[in-house]
Amino acid sequence: MACTLRLTIAALVLLGICHLSRPVAAYQRCSRYWYSWLPYDIERDRYDDGYRKCCYCRNAWTPWQCREDEQFERMRCGSRYYTLCCYTDDDNGNGNGNGNGYGNGNGNGNGNNYLKYLFGGNGNGNGEYWEEYIDERYDK
């Protein structure tokens, strides 16, 4: 019995060490969004009209640290505030992220978003995703 207990405790300790040593994201819910915390990086996933929208953020102190395709954002989660430079894979919140990345996806997007260039997209190109994202976030 004592041997089994010792083995169980040793296994749990090893399991805990292995779990903590993995570079696995810890998930936290803030409002209706899930934030996945990675080292110096936050991946934010949300669902809108059945499509998955991804937003990739990194820590920043000032807006001048953000690149041209990034948006400076100050987010509150619980009692803590975070300042971030973020970019998205959807130009206007309507596309589903399919396409070849160089053209206009399915014929109705302009294909000029940085992530569309990398991964493709079929947004309709008539609005900025960030405006819709911020409006949706604060209107609810």
Swiss-Prot record:
It comes from the Eukaryota. GO terms for cellular component: extracellular region. Residues 1-25 form the signal peptide. Component of conchiolin, the organic matrix of nacre. Only expressed in the dorsal region of the mantle. Its main location: secreted. It is found in: Secreted, Extracellular space, Extracellular matrix. Keywords: Disulfide bond, Extracellular matrix, Secreted, Signal. Coiled coil: none annotated. Belongs to the N16 matrix protein family. Heterooligomer; disulfide-linked. Pif97, Pif80, N16 and other proteins form a complex. May be specifically involved in the formation of the nacreous layer. This is N14 matrix protein.
